Amino acid sequence: MKSAISSSLFFNSKNLLNPNPLSRFISLKSNFLPKLSPRSITSHTLKLPSSSTSALRSISSSMASSFNPEQARVPSALPLPAPPLTKFNIGLCQLSVTSDKKRNISHAKKAIEEAASKGAKLVLLPEIWNSPYSNDSFPVYAEEIDAGGDASPSTAMLSEVSKRLKITIIGGSIPERVGDRLYNTCCVFGSDGELKAKHRKIHLFDIDIPGKITFMESKTLTAGETPTIVDTDVGRIGIGICYDIRFQELAMIYAARGAHLLCYPGAFNMTTGPLHWELLQRARATDNQLYVATCSPARDSGAGYTAWGHSTLVGPFGEVLATTEHEEAIIIAEIDYSILEQRRTSLPLNRQRRGDLYQLVDVQRLDSK
């Protein structure tokens, strides 16, 4: 049975038969250890003869192999593809948003042009950049993206600018209308001006923090049902929108599909932003050993929903490479994909996963086989 849920983590049932799945490895290692009391084992094991040390290393390697790391991803993880560019500049456009839609579109266009003039080959816009962020506004500002033209002036602008400037644009997100449904949708345009991918926010922002903030996107929006990964002139990119970043399974699926970079247009608020915004970006980058880029609207203290700001680029070691505060800003930062292999060689997580204990299942890829 096909499922709209794209992934799941589960424990391999064969291990439930053994309450201590490590016991067989421990018994193997004990053949090389002298009979020691618990108090003295640390000092004595430091003095093992070289032959025993070599044997332990050999067993350690054998153990790692028997952990079946290749089975920790179902289907197996794809190799990291060779990107079209090794180094390039990304532009993060942290924009102010008003109730004037025409102004918002014109303002975003100018910001994209400025980022490109400063060398950006990839430009990322914020979540809901053409509309105020509210359930009342989503139906009013929604566009029929598939119809294009006058039915979707925001995406028409993105298409024109990406083609003219020969850049890739991750178009933040806008409210999308499809029949009687509304989605929070990110459009990706290639350097030829063509729409290469469309990501509808999978995890809707429904929260209630007493005394702080309550917001229910599900009052007006419908959740998307498909993870989105796209090959572009600047590499393979996985797309999420704001709340999507909280779900590590989505990022893990993108990494297993060979993503170089994850892009999350988002609008964290003044409650969750200070605590979680940077933390989640660094976690997704570190766990999956890839780049993570985020872009927020600029803060407007007079708006009904106040964004945290702090658009950021994080490297594959979890390091913050570039960020800003809450005001309008255009960040230009370099991405170097050669670092991905360096980090993955230094910390070979893909060869150390415990496929004998857990697996990440990419339901979409599995169903397509």
From Swiss-Prot:
According to the entry, every stretch annotated as the CN hydrolase domain falls at: 88-337
Kindly list the GO molecular function terms attached to this UniProt entry. Answer: omega-amidase activity; zinc ion binding
Knockout-associated phenotype: 2-fold higher levels of alpha-ketosuccinamate and 3-fold higher levels of alpha-hydroxysuccinamate.
User: Cross-referenced InterPro entries, in alphabetical order?
Assistant: C-N_Hydrolase, C-N_Hydrolase_sf, Nit1/2_C-N_Hydrolase
Q: Which reaction does it catalyse?
A: a monoamide of a dicarboxylate + H2O = a dicarboxylate + NH4(+)
Which GO terms fall under biological process for this protein?
Answer: malate metabolic process; oxaloacetate metabolic process
Q: Where is the active site?
A: E127, K201, C242
Keyword Nucleus included in the entry's annotation: no
Report the sequence similarity comment from the record.
Belongs to the nitrilase superfamily. NIT1/NIT2 family.
Please give the name of this protein: Omega-amidase, chloroplastic
Q: Which source organism?
A: Arabidopsis thaliana (Mouse-ear cress)
Give the lineage.
Eukaryota, Viridiplantae, Streptophyta, Embryophyta, Tracheophyta
Q: Which gene encodes it?
A: NLP3
